Curated annotation (Swiss-Prot):
HAMAP family: CCA_bact_type2. The keyword Transferase applies. Its EC number is 2.7.7.72. The keyword RNA-binding applies. One of its GO terms (biological process) is tRNA 3'-terminal CCA addition. Its cofactor is Mg(2+). GO terms for molecular function: ATP binding; CCA tRNA nucleotidyltransferase activity; magnesium ion binding; tRNA binding. ATP binds at residues 8, 11, 91, 137, 140. It comes from Blochmanniella floridana. This is CCA-adding enzyme. Pfam families: PolyA_pol, PolyA_pol_RNAbd.
Amino acid sequence: MKKYLVGGAVRDSLLNLPITEKDWVITGSSAQEMLSIGYEQVGKDFPVFLHPKSHEEYALARTERKLGSGYTGFICHTEPSITIEEDLYRRDLTINAMAYDMNGNLLDPYNGQKDIQLRLLRHVSNAFYEDPLRVLRVARFAAKLKNIGFTIAIETFEIMTHMIHELKSLSPERVWMETKKALITDNPQVYFQVLKKCGALKILFPELDILFTIPQCTTHHSNLMNLGNQTMTRLSNISCLSNDLAIRYAILCCNLGSEMNPRKQPLKQLTQKKPQISIINNLCNRLKVPNNILKLTKIVFMYYHDLYDVTKLSSEMIMTIFQAFDCWRTPTRIELIIKINQSQLLGSKFHINYLFFQSTLLRTAFNETTQIKANDIINSGFSGINISQELYSRRLHVLKHWKNKFLTHKQ
């Protein structure tokens, strides 16, 4: 029996990146032997075992043979005679097809170390064709490693463009899993840009793909030209401001359904936005996006464009936004609102000082309204539904008074 550290841990160690998890491959052993020495089997499709103490995953070396379509049409073969080189051959990218033996020696049969030096994402073999999920994985690695200069090898990208016909065979869970991982990278927009370029976006995310055909109606980012590019820019912006998966996904969806409003008329009411909300619902249901993310996405969508220039908002609208985001019960939500505002202003025609001005307006406006407490209303003799009505009325009065002074002072 021989043990090898494989996959992302090897790649990240060579890139001097943090190692978040370790995966191991065992050669010269069998499932029966692994069980007999205390490992717990967890893999259904192929033998994967948990170490009895570290609980790290150990897989028996295996080869794969494609029999059907999609990513599930594989027959896995394990036996003690399979070598580590054979196991690494089935992997997607050369940078993921390296291993360390237990003496710390690097095994690199497919030149992964060279591609690390070249900063290239290159497929290991033509077996890459056999798994359509690899299109998403390569796009995700392009997003993950963008900051350190990685790009996709030309020949690998060409293969990806010829694989898109099999993408429909992917389960929603697998698509969401890769997308979720991509969204929490430093450059999530790269994931969608790669999918767009290779033709996968129109198959997996047609709601996003159509945005690249819709001209942008504002001159604030005149170089972006269309709503698809605008969405990518704002996704990049929010990623500089927040690591939160839910808010990044919400910003990704901020322009969905724009093709249903060709005249670009302001849509203020929920009834006017129902067709667009239904597109968000359909996308999230198809991908099986968690309900908490769906809920936030719809709230952000409702008020996203209002938050472009908060100096133009009425006090009533500011109160409505605070209520929609449940700020008084969850005060940290005000920072979320500010980040949504900033994600639209970064890189625009506005000076950076104006960005901070809007942030100050939102933050201070909220703080002013929090000075009015429910207990103050109760102590004034109000009860029942009258409490919330009076609380709203007083907060609105305070906000109007403060906002007038604030804007007058800044002029």
